[in-house]
Amino acid sequence: NHDFTTSNLAAIDQSNSTPTNNFCKINSLVNQGLAAFNVRQGGTQVLTGGNMSHVGTMGLTAGKWYWEGVQTSVTGTNYVGIGVAAVDADQGNSADSLGNSFTGWWTADNAYHETTSQSAQNVSYNTGWTGMSAGTVWSVALNCDTNPYQMTIRKNNRSVGTYIGNTKAVVPLIRVYANSSGDTYHNFGCPHVSALAGGNADANGYGNFKYAPPSGYYAICTKNLAQYGGDG
């Protein structure tokens, strides 16, 4: 008989996502780029061999949103892109068109890039920042209530710049360079790695983040989207 006793199950392995309040996760149906695509841990962990963009399952058109991520291990040249992609960006597994058109910070040249079309981008400005290393926690605070939207990216809770975007309907994105591989974890409120579990919820009490979300910013989940996400 089964006595329903849990075994080898840590608190970090339990999800805050419920049938009445689903959190954003990595979209396993978007097989984007040239690399193998392996989504684990409830859509929060992605194993890649490189040249791959990962996007979230929930689109954003209004509201203020916060999410985090970390690479716990890296081999090879470690370039990552952190930001958002337009919901109508080109997709395909023969080239990383999502990564070629995202808006955000690209550590290969430490510059902010801005989408110009469904498959292209331009360098908006050079930042002078340093790149990313294993264990570095990044976070994004996205304000879709401004027109155009405003996005602030932080590294280990220190701001690395604020950028004004030129599109309104977006999904969260991270891009991994072709010559690197490793474990990438995303935290939209349900962390499955202790590096992203700091016990910080948003103002509505949703989510578990490494760092406290900025005032007025919320976890990407269905209850918050219903309250702040506009008409979609």
Residue ranges and their predicted role:
Residues N1-G232:
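PRY/SPRY (B30.2) beta-sandwich protein-interaction domains
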